A protein has these predicted regions:
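Hydrophobic ligand-binding cavity/cleft-lining segments
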Residues: 12-23
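A structural signal for well-ordered alpha-helical scaffolds and beta->alpha junctions
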Residues: 14, 60, 111-112
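Vicinal oxygen chelate
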Residues: 2-9, 23-25, 31-33, 37, ...
Length: 155
């Protein structure tokens, strides 16, 4: 039997970082348990109301956040607040696959457009790696807006 995967990020501001990745991946914030949200409702506002109703102090309401693939195919992504800064290089990175199957100039043009979209959401561009066939199709290294040190690739 296969297992479901959840990817967990440490963050100083879980809500802000989850909102960036929600927009980057086309994911959604799920609503609180037992709450049926109208289609146009803001799930983050619903979480604030839910947490207030169950007595969670306001200063503790941004300690966790999550996003999910609305189609149910991708992993759930969880964000947890931590006080410390990153101490070492990450040994894992995420590839945001914006150009699967494309090669050469066409691929890099799609990746540049994706890079521009992600920069508009708050990411930062680090460097572009040109295609080097047959093994490297080319990619762009970026950082997320939370830490500026977590690298991911538009690939």
């Amino acid at each position: 039997m296969s297992r479901h995967l959840q990817v967990t990020f440490d963050a100083h501001d879980p809500r802000a970082l989850s909102s960036f990745w929600r927009d980057a991946l086309g994911y959604v914030h799920p609503g609180p348990p037992g709450v049926d949200l109208p289609e146009d409702a803001d799930p983050l506002a619903a979480w604030d109301d839910f947490l207030a109703r169950i007595g969670v102090p306001e200063e503790q309401r941004n300690t966790k956040s999550a996003i999910e693939d609305p189609d149910g195919h991708g992993p759930r992504v969880f964000f947890q607040q931590v006080p410390e800064d990153k101490a070492a290089k990450n040994r894992v990175h995420l590839d945001v696959r914006a150009a699967p199957g494309l090669r050469g100039k066409e691929r890099m043009a799609v990746l540049e457009a994706e890079c521009d979209r992600l920069v508009a959401l708050g990411a930062a561009r680090v460097r572009r790696h040109e295609p080097a066939p047959p093994m490297n199709a080319g990619f762009i290294v970026m950082t997320d807006p939370n830490t500026r040190d977590y690298q991911f690739c538009a690939a």
